[in-house]
Curated annotation (Swiss-Prot):
One of its GO terms (molecular function) is ATP binding. Keywords: Antibiotic resistance, ATP-binding, Cell membrane, Kinase, Membrane, Nucleotide-binding, Phosphoprotein, Transferase, Transmembrane, Transmembrane helix, Two-component regulatory system, Virulence. The gene is graS. Its EC number is 2.7.13.3. It is found in: Cell membrane. The chain crosses the membrane at residues 15-35, 43-63. It is a multi-pass membrane protein. GO terms for biological process: cellular response to phosphate starvation; response to antibiotic. It comes from Staphylococcus saprophyticus subsp. saprophyticus (strain ATCC 15305 / DSM 20229 / NCIMB 8711 / NCTC 7292 / S-41). Gene3D superfamilies: Histidine kinase-like ATPase, C-terminal domain (3.30.565.10). This is Sensor histidine kinase GraS. It catalyses: ATP + protein L-histidine = ADP + protein N-phospho-L-histidine. The keyword Transferase applies. Autophosphorylated.
Length: 342
């Protein structure tokens, strides 16, 4: 089928030449018909011979020229076309030289843009690291505040700033995540409680409590830093979209896997939005007045879950709440996946 496609493309490219030959043949037949001194049979013989030779010439040209375009279609680099002398005609050689020049320029442009992006990401990472120092110092100053209501208000805003800085830091590290992972056995309860501690100021200001149901012996084989980030994004969303309610967190063993379930009683997600919740920058279509949503939390979760081999399932009903499940792999599954990537 591929050869047939190329043959029809070749015929279309030669259609005017073929029509010109047919036109000349009709002219010759017309002259022979009008001039009795010229034998029609002789003209027919010449025409048939000419058509036969033309067909052979077309086949030869097709085999010679289409080979070059097939190589282009197979995405062979122009350097290979030049070095292997696959461009037979002067026109093909000019085309290869043009493509070579364009691709060289594009590669140089892409390299320059990559360097700019890496430079920007490095500068942004340095900025976040640098600003974390005064932010940490700010918390120490806030802790000394005597007015409790003022202290809680300041800690609430501090938590938001710290969360945004951490999220930005993780975003800049996404590209290098493979180089920034260390798998180990970690108590799941410890991971969750550490993240609850980080969000406690915002939770307290919104009247949100936590209901924990854990088995103390449940450990997961994962990367602590990136797994905590995933839990934090889900907890952050649960707190952000809830008021005066409870967040229920439980962990259990199902089959050979540990399952972490985080359930809130917040605004929930509409059914039409569920397929898009992992898209970067996507925020709810049912709550367009909310200006604090960044649309980055679940985007981060979606990227990281593949690297950690964690299955994430989300069920939600509008105005009823959301349930997020993390299904952790066992150690053998992680080792097998890492072995495939070596």
């Amino acid at each position: 089928m591929a050869n047939l496609k190329w043959f029809f493309i070749f015929l279309r490219s030669r259609i005017y030449w073929i029509l010109w030959l047919l036109f000349l043949h009709f002219i010759f037949l017309g002259i022979a018909y009008l001039d009795y001194d010229i034998s029609v049979y002789s003209i027919l013989y010449i025409i048939i011979l000419n058509i036969g030779l033309s067909v052979l010439f077309l086949i030869f040209t097709y085999l010679k020229e289409v080979k070059f375009y097939k190589h282009l279609d197979e995405n062979i680099e122009p350097e290979a076309l030049k070095h292997k002398s696959l461009a037979d005609t002067p026109f093909q050689q000019e085309m290869v030289n043009y493509l070579y020049g364009q691709i060289t320029n594009q590669k140089a442009l892409v390299t320059h843009q990559k360097q700019q992006i890496q430079s920007t990401e490095a500068a942004l990472t340095d900025f976040v690291h640098d600003i974390k120092t005064p932010v940490t110092a700010m918390k120490l100053l806030i802790e000394k505040e005597q007015d409790l209501s003022r202290k809680h208000a300041l800690l609430y805003e501090w938590s938001r700033i710290n969360d945004m800085l951490d999220r930005q830091l993780f975003l800049t590290r996404l590209e290098y995540q493979n180089k920034d992972m260390y798998f180990e056995h970690v108590p799941l309860k410890r991971l969750v409680i550490e993240e609850i501690q980080i969000t406690r100021y915002i939770s307290q200001s919104k009247g949100i409590g936590y209901d924990l149901d854990f088995e103390d012996t449940l450990n997961v084989y994962t990367d602590t830093k990136w797994c905590r980030m995933m839990i934090r994004q889900v907890l952050s969303n649960a707190v952000k979209y809830s008021e005066e309610s409870m967040i229920h967190i439980r962990a259990l063993k199902e089959s050979r896997h540990v399952v972490l379930e985080i359930k809130d009683e917040g605004k929930g997600i509409s059914e039409k939005d569920l397929p898009r919740i992992f898209d970067k920058g996507f925020t709810s279509t049912s709550n367009r007045n909310n200006t604090i949503s960044s649309g980055l939390g679940l985007y981060l979760v979606n990227h990281v879950k593949e690297k950690l081999s964690i299955c994430v399932r989300i069920h939600s009903e509008l105005d009823k709440g959301t349930v997020v499940k993390f299904i952790f792999p066992n150690q053998n599954e992680i080792v097998a996946k890492l072995s495939q990537n070596i």
